[in-house]
């Protein structure tokens, strides 16, 4: 990982979908090692400081751009091996470029090889279908009220920092996590104990997530994609 503090210097971020940024002459994906040579050279010439990759966790549907995940602990094999991805990150750091990855702790896809009804039961999602179903995206919401689900997700975030030395995570679709009525009509959601729309368990999870990451990686970038102007969304909790 780089030895400089992203918080104390200007940032210019280049967002990339690894599968479509550039292809080979035969229309095939570039590998992580190809990207290490071509993408980093381009980003450096354009004076960007950070590369933000759309999700690189394993996912079954190319058209989802990686946002409907089955394998949270697997870097997608579309572009190579875990060591190939490590090579890409190392090459970026050698050139003074930080790596951010989009991460999706809000919902997961329903494919049979994924987390939904993992052993025939609702392990990662709520028993309450109203809470579990994400009708807007055709996916399943995580149940943040389960400590084992919180542990799974926080451990996964830590995994990407520890195993691949990335510099930050951009947390996808935070509004979907924070609001019980996100994308829902009247009658499709139940207020919290205070009678409002906030998902209290999701709020607690996000606080624990940031506390855990910054305890071990104080220079990490934790970026919320939050579309509703939720007050103090970026206020430190540590």
Residue ranges and their predicted role:
Residues 1:
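Alpha-glucan (starch/glycogen) binding determinants
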Residues 4-11, 17-197:
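Substrate-binding/active-site clefts of carbohydrate-active enzymes
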Residues 165-167, 182-238:
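Conserved alpha/beta catalytic core and glycan-binding cleft of carbohydrate-active enzymes
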């Amino acid at each position: 990982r780089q030895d400089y503090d992203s918080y104390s210097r200007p940032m210019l971020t280049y967002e990339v979908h690894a599968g479509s940024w550039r292809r080979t002459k035969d229309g095939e994906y570039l590998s992580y090692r190809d990207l290490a040579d071509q993408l980093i050279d381009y980003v450096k010439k354009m004076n960007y400081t950070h590369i933000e990759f759309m999700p690189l966790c394993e996912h079954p549907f190319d058209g989802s751009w990686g946002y409907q995940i089955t394998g949270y602990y697997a870097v997608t094999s579309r572009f190579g091996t875990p060591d190939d991805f490590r090579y890409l990150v190392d090459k970026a750091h050698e050139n003074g470029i930080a790596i951010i990855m989009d991460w999706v702790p809000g919902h997961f896809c329903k494919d049979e090889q994924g987390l939904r009804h993992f052993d025939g039961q609702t392990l990662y999602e709520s028993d309450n279908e109203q809470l579990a179903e994400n009708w807007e995206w055709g996916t399943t919401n995580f149940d943040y009220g389960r400590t084992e689900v919180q542990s799974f997700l926080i451990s996964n975030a830590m995994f990407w920092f520890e195993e691949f030395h990335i510099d930050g995570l951009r947390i996808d679709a935070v509004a979907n996590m924070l609001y019980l009525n996100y994308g829902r009509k009247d009658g499709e959601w139940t207020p919290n104990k205070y009678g409002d729309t906030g998902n209290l368990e999701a709020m607690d999870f996000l606080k624990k997530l940031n506390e855990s990451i910054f305890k071990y990686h104080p220079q990490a970038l934790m970026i919320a994609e939050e579309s509703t102007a939720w007050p103090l969304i970026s206020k430190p909790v540590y």
